Amino acid sequence: MSYVPIVIEPTSRGERAYDIYSRLLKERIIFVCSTVEDHMANLIVAQLLFLEAENPKKDIYMYINSPGGVVTAGLAIYDTMQYIKPKVATLCIGQACSMGSLLLCGGEKGMRYSLPHSRIMIHQPSGGYKGQATDIEIHAQETLKIKRLLNELYSKHTEQELKHIEKSMERDNFMSPEEAKKFGLVDNIMSSRDAMALLAK
């Protein structure tokens, strides 16, 4: 089990301890920092909904360092990002691969960032199935539907032609921050917090 740092803050009633992620949540910062799967997605969705309820007009900041994961779990986070009222700024720290890259480019237009030495990767969905031939065919058709859906979402957020997206996602496609910016996955490359604050003005 990984160690989570504890932050202790003074209050009028003494001291209060927070785990580091809860403390950052107070600043409207959410971390997507592991494989995207159902349990993790439920936690991220809950945090997004909580921050909307707390202040629907104040921006949310999502920091992404993820290798990707389960498509349906990622789409649950993505749909919630689009559903809530606050703008969601996204920032890639380390990597945003597979579903992680969709969450990155699904942030508010003009508020999608990458740190200078991060990497971003897009590709088509994959899966393996076993069972009766008819069931395998059903799952294969569903995978193709998901592939088309993801292509359409990337096309929407990058403003690239659908055919170009389809070609770009045929295999693992790794990009530097500069390449990701040119592709339309991010809007700016940040080397310091001051640069982000300057762009926000």
UniProtKB/Swiss-Prot annotation:
Keyword Transferase recorded: no
Catalytic activity: Hydrolysis of proteins to small peptides in the presence of ATP and magnesium. alpha-casein is the usual test substrate. In the absence of ATP, only oligopeptides shorter than five residues are hydrolyzed (such as succinyl-Leu-Tyr-|-NHMec, and Leu-Tyr-Leu-|-Tyr-Trp, in which cleavage of the -Tyr-|-Leu- and -Tyr-|-Trp bonds also occurs)
Residue numbers annotated as active site: S98, H123
Class of enzymatic activity (EC top level): hydrolase
Compartments where located: Cytoplasm
GO CC, alphabetical: cytoplasm; endopeptidase Clp complex
EC number: 3.4.21.92
UniProt keyword Lipid biosynthesis, yes or no: no
Disulfide bonding pattern of the chain: none
InterPro entries: ClpP, ClpP/crotonase-like_dom_sf, ClpP/TepA, ClpP_His_AS, ClpP_Ser_AS
One annotated GO molecular function: serine-type endopeptidase activity
Keywords: Cytoplasm, Hydrolase, Protease, Serine protease
Stored SUPFAM superfamilies: ClpP/crotonase
GO biological process per UniProt: protein quality control for misfolded or incompletely synthesized proteins
PANTHER family, per the entry: ATP-DEPENDENT CLP PROTEASE PROTEOLYTIC SUBUNIT
Record note on quaternary structure: Fourteen ClpP subunits assemble into 2 heptameric rings which stack back to back to give a disk-like structure with a central cavity, resembling the structure of eukaryotic proteasomes.
Function: Cleaves peptides in various proteins in a process that requires ATP hydrolysis. Has a chymotrypsin-like activity. Plays a major role in the degradation of misfolded proteins.
Membership in a protein family: Belongs to the peptidase S14 family.
Protein name, as recorded: ATP-dependent Clp protease proteolytic subunit
Species annotation: Rickettsia conorii (strain ATCC VR-613 / Malish 7)
Lineage: Bacteria, Pseudomonadati, Pseudomonadota, Alphaproteobacteria, Rickettsiales
